[in-house]
């Protein structure tokens, strides 16, 4: 997830697309030539393009929020509870990487960021630091709640990407474009990371937080409202 300037201002993220070359060797060398041009997909409809913009806008806002939540937790807990420092750092580093990735996707597609970005920064840091000040278990309950909602959010996006982007290609076949494949792969990986964070929170006694239900259900509600708002504003 990369470098950071300070815990108050988490860093932005990077994104790369790799291609691979498979070489097969036989007793007598044979070379398979690649076609000069891969089949092109039809242009996205206005609705499909708008959906992608919403995906990138809300995911960038969400990962920014997660970056700041874990910055707040790390700031409060890392020195008070040294045994939690590597756990928190691992989670935060992954969120920094997620944040950087969607920052770059946002720039690449020229997607307008959420107008509520200053609110996401302040609110997320306050949520992370505030729950950490209550107790380590409350911080883990915060993580459990956030990652439960985000995991479900990413699953919904993956279903829509699978169902709405079966595009016609110039060679007569159908399927997602390389851009959609790449975005799908990114979201799948990030979804898995978030669920790993959820498991980590449970292993570190999130259920021992007091008051557990108030913290988790309150934060889940805040996250759902934030997702709805970031998609639209």
Curated annotation (Swiss-Prot):
Its EC number is 1.14.99.60, 1.14.13.253. It is found in: Mitochondrion inner membrane. PANTHER family: 5-DEMETHOXYUBIQUINONE HYDROXYLASE, MITOCHONDRIAL, COENZYME Q10 BIOSYNTHESIS PROTEIN 7. Changing residue 28 to A: Loss of phosphorylation and increased levels of COQ6. Binds 2 iron ions per subunit. It holds the Pfam family COQ7. The lineage of its organism: Eukaryota, Fungi, Dikarya, Ascomycota, Saccharomycotina. The modification Phosphothreonine is found at residue 32. Belongs to the COQ7 family. Its cofactor is Fe cation. It is an enzyme of class 1 (oxidoreductase). It comes from Saccharomyces cerevisiae (strain ATCC 204508 / S288c) (Baker's yeast). Fe cation 2 binds at residues 95, 147, 194, 197. It comes from the Eukaryota. This is 5-demethoxyubiquinone hydroxylase, mitochondrial. Changing residue 194 to K: Lacks ubiquinone and accumulates the intermediate DMQH2, causing respiratory deficiency. Fe cation 1 binds at residues 63, 95, 98, 194. InterPro entries: Ferritin-like_SF, Ubq_synth_Coq7. One of its GO terms (molecular function) is metal ion binding. The modification Phosphoserine is found at residues 20, 28. It is a peripheral membrane protein.
